[in-house]
Amino acid sequence: MQPAIQVWFGEDLPLSPRSPLTPRHGPGLANVCQYDEWIAVRHEATLLPMQEDLSIWLSGLLGIKVKAEKLLEELDNGVLLCQLIDVLQNMVKTCNSEESGNFPMRKVPCKKDAASGSFFARDNTANFLHWCRDIGVDETYLFESEGLVLHKDPRQVYLCLLEIGRIVSRYGVEPPVLVKLEKEIELEETLLNTSGPEDSISIPKSCCRHEELHEAVKHIAEDPPCSCSHRFSIEYLSEGRYRLGDKILFIRMLHGKHVMVRVGGGWDTLQGFLLKYDPCRILQFATLEQKILAFQKGVSNESVPDSPARTPQPPEMNPLSAVNMFQKQNSKPSVPVSIPKSKEKQGRPPGALVPASSLKGGNLGSMSVRSKLPNSPAASSHPKLKSSKGITKKPQAPSNNASSSLASLNPVGKNTSSPALPRTAPCISESPRKCISSPNTPKAKVIPAQNSADLPESTLLPNKCSGKTQPKYLKHNHISSRDNAVSHLAAHSNSSSKCPKLPKANIPVRPKPSFQSSAKMTKTSSKTIATGLGTQSQPSDGAPQAKPVPAQKLKSALNLNQPVSVSSVSPVKATQKSKDKNIVSATKKQPQNKSAFQKTGPSSLKSPGRTPLSIVSLPQSSTKTQTAPKSAQTVAKSQHSTKGPPRSGKTPASIRKPPSSVKDADSGDKKPTAKKKEDDDHYFVMTGSKKPRK
């Protein structure tokens, strides 16, 4: 203990750049562990005067040498404390026989061979504490048995012994020197309060010499030298009485080497007091906590490299958030954000999944259409069809059919038909839901190629012409059946079975085989869109512009279960034609179409009559058309059933379709009336059944 205190408080400690302060100020905060150690040593240093005083007092009472440095080790087994009880009781009896009656006298049991830290040591300590309570020691001065046995609370042990000295001093027993100094100070304070400073000066200071005390105070006050404007002033008032800053305190010399300051009911060293109250020295203590915290933060920032968790990670693109972004930027060309295929599958489970290859090959037509569209963001995002597909999936979580239609709608609406995007984007979520109800008829007709082509139109129409677009798609189905009766029937059955949710978008696919007829349909659909939606007619115009893609590409797109934008170009044309034909009946048949969609079943269950036909055609679900030619009625039925998740498209059917569709395109012009009659009859039957429901 002594060497450590000498190191911290001695005058020979060399100063280093890291600890520029004098030893009395401590080592500074360059090393927190070293500073903590110094704080502990400083606390022990303030205890050292009490340790020495108590060791001298106990040595005199017990007649044995008690070392101040090992005071706790001497007391921790409780044997000396029990012996102290016997000595004090005997001294009280001999010193003051009259007052001894008030002092409790009793035999305290003691295990004299108790080992340090043992249960018997705790038992001895507990017996001592019980006696302390009997003689009137206040609870504030008492300590726990563990505090002494394990050396946890030395200060409290010393304060308890000092309190015992105060109590026994009333019975004529010599107390510790600190207790004597307390009595002198109390007497001086009493004289100061009653008379004046002159009387207090006459009080004999038995424990200190005036000259030595004053020199010691001056030395401590001037070390280190301070030239601060707010220098802490120490003013001499009288012998042992000084003004320290704004406080008047009593200072005493203990055993000729410790300058002690009476603070409250206890004692502190003058050095420790100045460290706490001197503005020049308080820096290391009053702001100790803040400084240590700041220092630790600085160390952690400098030494610990930024962990990956700390480094800001780019936010993960949320499909819905991406959709919202596109809606806001619908007027501007936007690049869709690519989404993992796994996410795409989740977005459009039924038939919305579109492999990258199909997007590239199957969507060529749709890409060209988008690029041609004046405002379509797709023009700028042709290479990112995959991402657009992923985006379309995002708003379509509500249902498989809706998701598939949205898959086609979103890429097209966002990429293909930017003019309608402002309107379509906000309603994308609504259109998918509506598409669910109306996809039934278009589902059978939905073909990957038309999906992308029709998507622009449908995306343009979803908000305003949801009702009209549905009839148009129905017309598309009829027209395509006329042009491509066999191929359309196969396409309807395939798309309906495979792409239940993307029927509308798939319906334009039927026109795939007949690129010419699809082009015509796109023209008509553009006209109908213009009449029905006004601004939506622009995307339809863009759709006819889309270049048709070979039937093989359309087949591959269908096989890949991807929205075939290429094939969609031709279906777009066909759909446009059908839309032109159905524009007149669109307004009339909208309720019918809605009711028909409701009848169709799964699609009507989701949102019967809500989804516009344009929305239905929008979905770019990858559906493989089946070659099996069916009647227009079977096509419509299959379209209704296609609302279920699109099954893996049949590649052979799709392969067959292109040629058949080409033939149908030729025959579509010749036999449009017959197919129209069949389709119209079936359509009217469906509508009639739904009208009574409405």
UniProtKB/Swiss-Prot annotation:
InterPro entries: CH_dom, CH_dom_sf, GAR_dom, GAR_dom_sf
Annotated Low complexity bias: 331-340, 397-411, 517-531, 563-572
One annotated Gene Ontology cellular component of this protein: microtubule
Pfam family for this entry, one: GAS2
Span of domain Calponin-homology (CH): 48-168
Cited Gene3D superfamilies: Calponin-like domain, Gas2-like domain
Domain GAR residue range list: 208-281
Residues found modified as Phosphothreonine: T441
Compartment(s) where it occurs, according to its Swiss-Prot or TrEMBL record: Cytoplasm; Cytoplasm, Cytoskeleton
Compositionally biased residues, Basic and acidic residues: 663-683
Primary localization: cytoplasm
Annotated stretches, region: Disordered: 299-694
Tissue: Expressed in the pancreas, heart, liver, placenta, brain, skeletal muscle, kidney and lung.
Biased composition (Polar residues): 365-379, 584-606, 617-642
GO molecular function: actin binding; actin filament binding; microtubule binding
Cell division in keyword set: no
Keyword terms: Actin-binding, Cytoplasm, Cytoskeleton, Microtubule, Phosphoprotein
CDD domains for the chain: CH_GAS2L3
Gene Ontology terms: biological process: actin crosslink formation; actin cytoskeleton organization; microtubule cytoskeleton organization
The protein's assembly and partners: Interacts (via CH domain) with F-actin. Interacts (via C terminus) with microtubules. Interacts with MAPRE1.
Family designation: Belongs to the GAS2 family.
Domain comment, as recorded: The GAR domain modulates the binding strength to each cytoskeletal network.
Role summary: Cytoskeletal linker protein. May promote and stabilize the formation of the actin and microtubule network.
Protein name listed in UniProt: GAS2-like protein 3
Organism, as annotated: Homo sapiens
